[in-house]
Amino acid sequence: MMYHIPGVLSPQDVARFREQLEQAEWVDGRVTTGAQGAQVKNNQQVDTRSTLYAALQNEVLNAVNQHALFFAAALPRTLSTPLFNRYQNNETYGFHVDGAVRSHPQNGWMRTDLSATLFLSDPESYDGGELVVNDTFGQHRVKLPAGDLVLYPSSSLHCVTPVTRGVRVASFMWIQSMIRDDKKRAMLFELDNNIQSLKSHYGESEEILSLLNLYHNLLREWSEI
């Protein structure tokens, strides 16, 4: 399943990020890509050795970790270090698949269950640059407001179409979920959303408490910690 997570960054945070990224050191995006991806990748990324990068990636991690909808949809166990990319002048990233595992500075290795893109450019400021994701439900084209994030299974083939006008800037990362199976994770997310909706309409009740108990028992049964 694909999920739109709105308002991960406020407009003020986005503006500050963009101002700082104007001063960043950008390098060839292929430095973080395997052999298959390097053949179809043509973009730029912030140099991960820079002091600015260290500060910005920490801010992204803090923002997603504090976002309740992101947590409910991803049920994250491990987050990769966020990266930042930029597309302009017809730069693009052809169809590719993300690696199943990635190195992690604290955990050694992590499994990539979910991929996330946090948009940092207003969609009206550039042409092209859609994230295109192919999954079992068809093809999805994504171009979200700045500050919003999209989550999708890392097993999906995906690409970024050429940016023919303006500049597209984003942060991206991978998530190892506590729930490996996409279908089980989607069921838990739906159950959680329905519980929250019922609570907002009817307040606390024994029936809602019973559903909450069911949610946590399923999470306990399926989670890998």
UniProtKB/Swiss-Prot annotation:
Give GO BP annotations, semicolon-separated.
DNA damage response; intracellular iron ion homeostasis
Amino acids binding 2-oxoglutarate: R168
- Where would I find the Fe2OG dioxygenase domain in this sequence? 78-177
Keyword terms: Dioxygenase, Iron, Metal-binding, Oxidoreductase, Vitamin C
SUPFAM superfamilies, per this entry? Answer: Clavaminate synthase-like
Question: GO: which molecular function terms?
Answer: 2-oxoglutarate-dependent dioxygenase activity; iron ion binding; L-ascorbic acid binding
Q: Could you say which cofactors this protein requires?
A: Fe(2+); L-ascorbate
What residues does Fe cation bind to? H96, D98, H158
What's its EC?
1.14.11.-
Q: What class of enzyme is it?
A: oxidoreductase
InterPro entries tied to this protein: Oxoglu/Fe-dep_dioxygenase_dom, PKHD_C, PKHD_hydroxylase, Pro_4_hyd_alph, Pro_4_hyd_alph_FE2OG_OXY
Q: What does the cofactor field's note say?
A: Binds 1 Fe(2+) ion per subunit.
Q: Which Pfam families match?
A: 2OG-FeII_Oxy_3, PKHD_C
Tell me where on the tree of life, at the top rank, the source sits: Bacteria
Q: What is this protein called?
A: PKHD-type hydroxylase YbiX
Primary gene name: ybiX
